[in-house]
């Protein structure tokens, strides 16, 4: 995942730190379907049954260039990710929900590496200058992750029973 790792993979980089900060700010205080609230700052208290942690796991990326005509190219950046809920009391993943994101733009010239990097950066940080996307001032990935987390039922525990 060259673009993802190059942008947010180095934990000590400014971009990675900024991305995590933006994610924490968006998550703070959001209510889930089960009535619980997300907190990026408060620590869970296991004795009170606060054992869940929610994570975003990016599994795959794909940058695709398509020639539509002599003077039009399509550039798309896809990310496959999973929302994971981990129960610390049970030491188990209790929920896993896939999400797929695609950013798509049209260019009048063959896309350059700079264009590809720019589209990947928009996925993680948005297009504040509104050069390519008028309505995407913040991170597309964070926005869609938060929508999915809030629309997904996350249980405290998951029980599987197999009958033979």
Q: What positions do the PLM features span?
A:
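Surface-exposed short loop/turn segments
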Residues: 44-90
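Domain-level marker for long, solvent-exposed, non-transmembrane regions
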Residues: 25, 29-31, 70-73, 92
